[in-house]
């Protein structure tokens, strides 16, 4: 079993599939690149936890 401390949350844009390490990076991408209305941002991404050893493979 993987310990919680060895997990990192990542965020994925549902419009283009890009993955980001921070929610701030994702929001900046959605507003500036994808032109998403800031009031509806929650519908355009998903977040999930990955083990630290796999983070660099994903991003």
Swiss-Prot record:
Zinc finger (C2H2-type): 11-33
Source domain of life: Viruses
Stated name of the protein: Putative zinc finger protein ORF59a
InterPro entries xref list: Znf_C2H2_sf (IPR036236), Znf_C2H2_type (IPR013087)
GO molecular function, one term: zinc ion binding
UniProt keyword list: Metal-binding, Zinc, Zinc-finger
């Amino acid at each position: 079993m993987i310990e919680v401390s060895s997990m990192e949350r990542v965020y994925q844009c549902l419009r283009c599939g890009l993955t980001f390490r921070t929610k701030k990076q994702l929001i900046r991408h959605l507003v500036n690149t994808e032109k998403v209305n800031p009031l509806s941002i929650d519908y355009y991404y998903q977040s999930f936890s990955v083990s630290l050893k796999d983070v660099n493979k994903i991003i």
